[in-house]
């Protein structure tokens, strides 16, 4: 079994078993199942793991913020709203992570105003990337705190230039003072505003607000 060590495990709140080996994680999961339904099942099988349990997550989210005068993108530290800048997450799809890195660079170059949850002011709140594992289609969702998105046409054009593999780009508008990532309104900026993927022979349409 291949093992890698996450450099963010002591600060990031996304992975609760990041300090254990993958083998230990599988054992712990089996023990959890046994503790819940063991009295009903005599023979609980071992958990089936992956040979390479990394870069498998095809829904990748990052929140934007500022560290001093620098724009950062990452995830919240556990139990806080302190953003931990993430450059290379070991469980996120590598292609999605690269797109988020590019979006962060473009935010800086286009001087997009980052949303401040304390003051309720600013434009860009989050970025979400979804990837169809069978179709390889990619959706980028830019979550803004208002309908206005300065330089959006040039922003989208440059993002597509750097990542021609992107299928669709959507602006999601979340004007609420809430910890919820997505709002209810979606505005396609490029493409159809959704992607499709195939699972068990069935084709599904995936929107920004899908599971």
Language model features with spans:
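Accessory RNA-recognition modules of RNA-modification enzymes
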Residues: 1-211
């Amino acid at each position: 079994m291949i093992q890698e060590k996450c450099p963010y495990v002591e600060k990031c709140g996304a992975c609760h078993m990041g300090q254990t080996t993958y083998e230990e994680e599988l054992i712990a999961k089996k023990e959890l199942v046994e503790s819940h339904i063991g009295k009903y099942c005599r023979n609980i099988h071992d958990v089936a793991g992956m040979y390479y349990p990394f870069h498998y997550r095809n829904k990748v989210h990052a929140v934007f913020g500022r560290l001093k005068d620098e724009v950062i993108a990452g995830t919240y530290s556990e139990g806080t709203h302190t953003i931990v800048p993430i450059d290379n997450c070991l469980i996120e799809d590598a292609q999605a992570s690269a797109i988020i890195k590019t979006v962060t660079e473009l935010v800086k170059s286009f001087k997009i105003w980052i949303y401040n949850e304390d003051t309720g002011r600013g434009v860009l709140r989050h970025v979400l990337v979804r990837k169809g594992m069978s179709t390889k289609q990619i959706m980028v969702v830019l979550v803004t705190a208002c309908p206005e998105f300065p330089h959006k046409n040039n922003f989208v054009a440059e993002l597509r230039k750097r990542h021609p593999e992107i299928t669709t780009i959507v602006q999601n508008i979340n004007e609420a003072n809430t910890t919820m990532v997505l709002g209810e309104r979606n505005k396609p900026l490029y493409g159809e505003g959704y992607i499709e993927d195939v699972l068990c022979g069935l084709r599904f349409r995936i929107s920004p607000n899908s599971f």
